[in-house]
Curated annotation (Swiss-Prot):
Function field: Required for S phase entry of the cell cycle.
Organism name: Nematostella vectensis
Similarity annotation: Belongs to the CDC123 family.
Protein name per the record: Cell division cycle protein 123 homolog
Keywords, in A-Z order: Cell cycle, Cell division, Cytoplasm
InterPro entries from the UniProt entry: CDC123 (IPR009772)
Keyword Cytoplasm carried by entry: yes
One CC-aspect GO term: cytoplasm
Sequence ranges of Acidic residues compositional bias: 58-73
Superkingdom of source: Eukaryota
UniProt key word Hydrolase: no
Length: 329
């Protein structure tokens, strides 16, 4: 994969060509100052100072919070202001019907949906958007290493970032599909929501494949600049399909129910179609660990052996006093 393949999947690169078959969207260029703000640690929303919350119902913590609030330097964090972007976001939200779905050039902050009040990416104000962007590791990777998997990757980074606001759609996850195009041929279709089993998908395989193939051949085929790529599509009940997004063909794009070695097989006799076959075949969602502290993720996955050793040592220290008392008794 080359950097140009990634650039071709940049939203503003493909949207003008496919705007008639995708969701209505607005593109807002981001200033360097705003991008730097997104890269900084911590979640301080623009517009007003961020005060530490009062935990009045928690008596055990009340004294601690009171001490913090009495110190102005600890109680209030100066918030940045981006009035121009703020105004553009408000105008775009109004033009798009009052509710939007945010993303940057390539990715949406799906891993941060847990922090919103309804566990979705539905946003009604600039503050909703800022909170999701600042809470997302996915967005951080887009900003810092968009070309990390490219064979012609260099020290030069992408420096033109955009906020994309898409008109909010109530999408039924079962009808989202990821489609794989190799050498200008649609070779595979995967269920997008692999963390759930939908019994009717396998039963309607022929209809689903026919509708998506027709959409590809009539609306997308040979119109995208690359010969191999991935696109996501939403299928409605009336055979209509809507384009959701484009992604590069290969890592880091998630092949979902396929593997890249399987998709790269020289001969693909027929269009491959995969869905979760039963409740037993359900896989964890790609952001299942996003709600856990990183230390907990490292412990459970074995990613950091040192943390696991420390954890076991602490456990031994905790048990020793009890064990000694048992022996004494």
């Amino acid at each position: 994969m080359k950097q140009q393949h990634v650039e071709n999947c940049n939203f503003s690169s493909w949207y003008p060509r496919f705007k008639n078959v995708t969701i209505r969207s607005k593109i807002i260029p981001l200033s360097k100052e705003f991008v730097d703000y997104l890269k900084t640690d911590g979640v301080v929303l623009p517009g007003k100072p961020s005060s530490l919350p009062r935990h009045e119902d928690d008596e055990s913590d009340s004294e601690e919070w009171q001490n913090l609030e009495e110190d102005p330097e600890q109680a209030t964090v100066e918030a940045p202001e981006f009035n121009d972007i703020d105004t553009k976001i408000k105008e775009a939200i109004q033009e798009l019907g009052g509710e939007v779905f945010p993303k940057l050039n390539w990715s949406a902050p799906r891993d941060a949906s847990w922090i919103s009040h309804d566990n979705t990416l539905r946003c009604k104000s600039p503050g909703d958007i800022y909170l999701l962007l600042k809470s997302s590791d996915t967005i951080d990777r887009v900003l810092c290493d968009a070309f990390i998997h490219c064979e012609d990757n260099s020290t030069q980074t992408h420096d033109s970032f955009e906020l994309i606001l898409r008109k909010w759609q109530n999408i039924y996850p079962a009808m989202e599909f990821r489609c794989f195009v190799r050498n200008n041929e649609l070779v595979a279709i995967s269920q997008r929501d692999i963390s759930n089993y939908y019994h009717f998908l396998a039963e309607n395989e022929d209809e689903i494949c026919a509708d998506i193939l027709n959409f590809y051949e009539s609306k997308i085929a040979e119109k995208f600049p690359d010969t191999s790529y991935v696109f996501d599509v939403y299928k409605y009940a009336d055979q209509k399909c809507t384009l959701i997004d484009f992604s590069p063909y290969g890592v880091p794009t998630n092949p979902l129910l396929f593997t890249w070695s399987e998709l790269d097989t020289e001969v693909v006799p027929d269009l491959l179609f995969k869905v979760v076959p039963s409740a037993i075949g359900v896989q964890p969602g790609p952001f299942a660990c996003s709600r856990l502290p990183q230390d907990m993720v490292d412990l459970t996955s074995g990613a950091d052996v040192n943390k696991l050793v420390d954890f076991l040592n602490v456990g031994n220290l905790i048990r020793r006093p009890g064990e000694a008392s048992d022996d004494d008794s």
